[in-house]
A protein has these predicted regions:
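Short beta->alpha transition motifs characteristic of CBS
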Residues: 90, 106-111, 115, 196-198, ...
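Short, small/polar residue-rich loop motifs at catalytic or cofactor-binding pockets
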Residues: 87-91, 261-265, 459
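Conserved, well-ordered alpha-helix/loop/beta-strand core segments that scaffold catalytic motifs
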Residues: 151, 225-266
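Beta-lactam-recognizing serine transpeptidase/beta-lactamase-like catalytic domain environment
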Residues: 25, 104, 225-226, 272-313, ...
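Membrane-entry signal-anchor segments at the cytosolic-membrane interface
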Residues: 25-54
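Aromatic-capped interface at the extracytoplasmic side
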Residues: 60-85, 227-228
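Small/polar-residue-rich segments within soluble enzyme cores
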Residues: 2, 8-20, 37, 43, ...
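Second-shell loop/turn segments in exported
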Residues: 81-86, 110-119, 127-131, 148-156, ...
């Protein structure tokens, strides 16, 4: 059906109107068309979405790269930035005594570092939490946190229990760094033997220093810059020859003696003459290696090993053995004790000359029993001085070290050969233990040869590294035993020394049920100018039991005060106390030949009819 005339008229009118508008509007240029398209709202929206999608794709790919490809490397870098890189400390093996009691050990302690840059809670809140565990001032902690972003050291020497409490706070930014700390459970009991480890983890004395290589082992977990770790141990431990039980008895009684006589210092050694094992090495005054920084630096030195002194009369038995071995005397000889003699321009007299005067002809045994200086001069005069010097230097090794496995040992000192051989007085003073010097340890070693049938052994405090089964996997090398006296000579000398204890200057060391050989010593101390002053050094050396000689016990007290301070009054009673414990701990049966034992055997049993 055709459109109505009106409709056709409207279309013609509309077309005409559009034609007029078209003729009146200027035609759009290509640039205008492009601008129109770019400014289209829809197009702008699409562009924004495209940019966002591209960014998200780029970010996603980057995250994937970081998390999947180089995640491990980034973790290492982060740990290096956030953890504290401390100097690694080498772990150390335990030290134990001859019974396996722990003497030194490692314990894990922690150092707390704080990194405020990693806090997820307010600094004041974290400071308050830490202060409740460590007892620190929270206000001061807050100020510290504000001053630095990372690596603040708050506390050291934190125990495992305290470290556990800190971990329980669950705070970000805390870093507990473990390290081994050397601990000495028995405090000052072994300090001059063990030595100590300083705050930097370095050995400074004793076995810790001497056997650094054997005591230390590398633990790769200790010292790494990771927040939490633990210390592992191997099963090796360093076993010493020291007996903790006897050491404590000796140390306690030595300290009492030093205090009672106002002495400068004291030393007490117990040595097994057959093996050279040192059962006791007590020194007074001493120090606690756990708190070495509080001690007098003089106490760090083991003066029984490092310091020289003139042994005095305790060397007389050694001289008698030399004279017997060199055939200069026999056991039945007599010498004239005039009480006072002149050697060149030097007068020599007995300590008791003012009260006892001359004794006249006396036996070699009585020379030792009464500790006669004049008698010893007459004995050693029978030995050519060249021979005497050869004995001292070559056979006894007075100018050498003993070879003990402790640091700081000092060589003994004797005069040059020409000076000794060419001077009558040098041999005379050496005969009663003056004019030369040695260590306390070397004197004990020499008396050990008398107890060990003439064999000189190397004294030592270390048995070696032992494993969990008790097997020795490493031991120090030691010189072979050296025969310096014949067994017959040592038997004769011990019989003489026995009378010193039974009926002589060493009677304070007499032990019920046992025959003890001994010798007292009271020597004037040489001054720095080479003369002798008023100070003295007193000592007593014993060998027990005489029937089966084995143990040497030597006590030396330096500069005791008082008119009655002699070897027989100061050192001999101290040795007796140690001997009483020694025979019990070592299970030494009573000597049947001792007077008290014979009395006990003859006494009837009260239960018998």
């Amino acid at each position: 059906m055709d459109a109505s005339p009106r409709s056709r008229h409207r279309r013609r009118k509309s077309s005409a109107h559009l034609a007029r508008l078209s003729r009146s509007r200027p035609r759009s240029t290509p640039e205008q068309i492009r601008d129109f398209r770019l400014n289209s709202p829809r197009l702008r929206l699409i562009s924004v979405w495209l940019v966002l999608v591209a960014g998200m794709l780029g970010l996603g790919s980057r995250l994937a790269y970081l998390q999947l490809v180089i995640a491990d490397d980034l973790q290492v870098i982060a740990q290096e930035q956030q953890a504290i890189q401390a100097t690694p400390r080498t772990s150390r093996r335990q030290m134990v005594d001859r019974q396996g009691n722990v003497i030194a050990m490692d314990r894990v302690v922690y150092t707390l570092y704080v990194h405020p840059m990693l806090f997820k809670k307010p600094s004041s809140t974290i400071a308050q939490s830490i202060s409740t565990v460590l007892g620190l001032d929270p206000k001061q902690l807050t100020r510290k946190f504000a001053a630095e972003e990372s690596g603040i050291q708050l506390s050291t020497d934190i125990s495992e229990e305290t470290a556990k409490r800190l971990r329980g706070l669950r705070l970000d930014g805390l870093d507990l760094l473990p390290s081994p700390k050397r601990v000495y459970p028995q405090s000052a009991l072994f300090s001059q033997v063990t030595g100590y480890i300083d705050l930097e983890g370095q050995p400074k004395a004793g076995i810790e220093l001497a056997l650094q290589e054997q005591l230390s082992y590398d633990d790769p977990k200790v010292g790494e810059p990771t927040p939490l770790q633990h210390v592992t141990r191997d099963d090796l431990q360093m076993q010493l020859t020291i007996d903790s039980r006897l050491q404590r008895i000796a140390q306690d009684n030595l300290a009492k003696t030093v205090a009672e006589y106002g002495a400068k210092r004291g030393a007490l050694l117990v040595m097994d003459s057959r093996t050279g094992e040192i059962l006791t090495m007590a020194i007074a005054p001493t120090y606690d290696p756990n708190k070495y920084y509080d001690a007098n630096i003089e106490y760090f030195r083991n003066w029984a090993v490092s310091d020289l002194y003139e042994p005095g009369s305790t060397f007389k038995p050694i001289n008698v053995a030399i004279a017997l071995e060199d055939k200069a005397i026999t056991a039945t000889d007599l010498v004239n004790d005039a009480g006072r003699i002149q050697i060149g321009k030097w007068p020599i007299q007995n300590v008791d000359y003012s009260t006892n005067g001359p004794r006249g002809p006396i036996s070699i045994t009585d020379v030792l029993r009464y500790s006669s200086n004049v008698g010893m001069v007459r004995i050693m005069e029978r030995l050519p001085r060249a021979n005497y010097y050869e004995w001292l230097e070559q056979k006894l090794g007075l100018g050498d070290r003993t070879g003990i496995d402790l640091p700081g040992e000092t060589n003994g000192q004797i005069k040059a050969r020409d000076q000794f051989v060419g001077s009558e007085v040098e041999a005379a003073t050496t005969s009663f233990g003056q004019g030369f010097s040695l260590t306390v340890l070397q004197l004990a070693q020499l008396h050990g040869s008398l107890a060990n049938r003439g064999k000189l052994v190397t004294p030592h405090v270390v048995r070696g590294l032992t494993n969990a089964e008790g097997e020795i996997t490493w031991a120090p090398e030691r010189a072979a035993a050296k025969q310096i006296f014949s067994p017959e000579t040592t038997r004769i000398v011990l019989d003489m020394m026995k009378d010193v204890v039974n009926d002589g200057t060493g009677s304070a060391a007499k032990l019920d049920g046992y025959q003890v050989a001994g010798k007292t010593g009271t020597a004037q101390k040489a001054t720095e100018y080479g003369t002798y002053g008023d100070q003295r050094i007193t000592s007593f050396v014993s060998i027990a039991p005489v029937s089966d000689p084995r143990y040497v016990v030597l006590a030396v007290i330096d500069e005791p005060q008082g008119e009655n301070a002699y070897g027989g009054t100061v050192a001999a009673p101290l040795v007796k106390k140690v001997l009483e414990s020694l025979v019990v701990l070592e299970g030494i049966a009573p000597d049947a030949s001792s007077p008290s034992s014979r009395q006990q055997q003859q006494q009837p049993d009260a239960n018998q009819n």
